[in-house]
A protein has these predicted regions:
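An interfacial alpha-helical scaffold signature
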Residues: 1-247
Length: 247
C-alpha cells in the first residue's frame, strides 16, 4: 500500500468530489515513475503515449515495481513529481493513467489535468488585518480538519504548531477562518504559505475563505489545534534473562 492507496478506500472514480480532490493533491506531491518511449538522453525525455478512446494518455505508477509489473518487464522510465508530469501532459494535450490495477487507479483526462494545474497555481496574497478571533465553525472543522492534519504532518520540522480559528464579529457563525502557523522561519514562510494555499484550493471552499497567518502568539483555547509532535516508539520492556532462581 502506498500513500495514494491509503486515500483510495473508495476508488477514485466512485469517490465524491472532496475525496477525489485529496487524491489529486497527494498525486501532485508524489514522485511518479512514468513510462518513456526510449531511454532518456541527457535531460530530454519522450513520454510513452497510449491511444485510448478519449485520446492519448501517459502511464505512471508510484513505484518502479508497479510500472515493471504492468509491462511484465523492465521498461524505460523517468521519475518526476506529479505536478511536473501534469504540466508536461497539459502541453502535450494528453491524459494520464495512474497505477492501473491498483486501489489508487485513476484515469485523468485533459479537463481533469487542467483543473489540477489551476489548483496548483493557487498562491497566497500577502496582507495584514486586525481580526476578532472566535471558535471555528463546526462545518469547517468537519470539512478541513483531516486533510489539513495530513498536510501539516508533511511540515513537521519546519513549523512548531498550527491551529484553526474563526474570525468575525457578526452572526452566529464566523465570517471567515484563519490557519495560524507558529515557529516557521521567516525565509521558509513563503514556501509554507504556497503549500497551504495549494492544499486549501483542493478542499471544499469555506464561507469567507481561509487565510494563513504566521504568528508566535499562543492560539486561543477555543482553537482547533493540530498535534505536530513526533511520536516516539515505546521501548519494549526488558525481557528477563531466565527464570528466577528459587532458594
Amino acid at each position: 500500500m502506498t500513500a495514494l492507496d491509503d486515500l483510495a478506500a473508495i476508488p477514485f472514480h466512485d469517490a465524491d468530489a472532496p475525496a477525489r480532490a485529496r487524491m489529486l493533491s497527494r498525486l501532485a506531491d508524489t514522485q511518479l515513475i512514468v513510462a518513456l518511449a526510449a531511454d532518456p538522453v541527457s535531460d530530454d525525455v519522450e513520454l510513452k503515449l497510449f491511444p485510448l478512446e478519449g485520446g492519448q494518455v501517459a502511464l505512471a505508477c508510484d513505484t518502479e515495481d508497479r510500472l515493471a509489473g504492468f509491462f511484465g518487464a523492465a521498461t524505460p522510465y523517468a521519475g518526476m513529481p506529479g505536478r511536473v508530469l501534469a504540466g508536461l501532459l497539459s502541453q502535450a494535450g494528453a491524459g494520464l493513467l495512474v497505477n492501473p490495477g491498483q486501489p489508487s487507479e485513476m484515469l485523468l483526462d485533459q479537463s481533469m489535468l487542467a483543473w489540477l494545474q489551476t489548483a496548483l497555481a493557487a498562491a497566497p496574497v500577502e496582507g495584514s488585518a486586525a481580526l476578532t478571533l472566535r471558535a471555528p465553525a463546526a462545518e469547517t472543522v468537519a470539512a478541513l480538519a483531516e486533510p489539513l492534519a495530513e498536510r501539516l504532518a508533511d511540515l513537521r520540522g519546519m513549523i512548531a504548531g498550527a491551529a484553526l480559528v474563526g474570525a468575525g464579529d457578526a452572526g452566529e457563525s464566523p465570517e471567515s477562518h484563519v490557519l495560524m502557523i507558529a515557529g516557521a522561519p521567516s525565509e521558509e514562510q513563503p514556501a509554507i504559505a504556497k503549500a497551504l494555499a495549494e492544499t486549501l484550493a483542493f478542499l471544499p471552499p469555506q464561507p469567507g475563505g481561509v487565510d494563513v497567518s504566521f504568528a508566535e502568539t499562543a492560539p486561543p483555547a477555543f482553537a482547533l489545534r493540530f498535534d505536530l509532535s513526533i511520536e516516539q516508539a515505546t521501548p519494549a520492556p526488558a525481557r528477563p534473562k531466565g527464570p528466577p532462581i528459587l532458594r
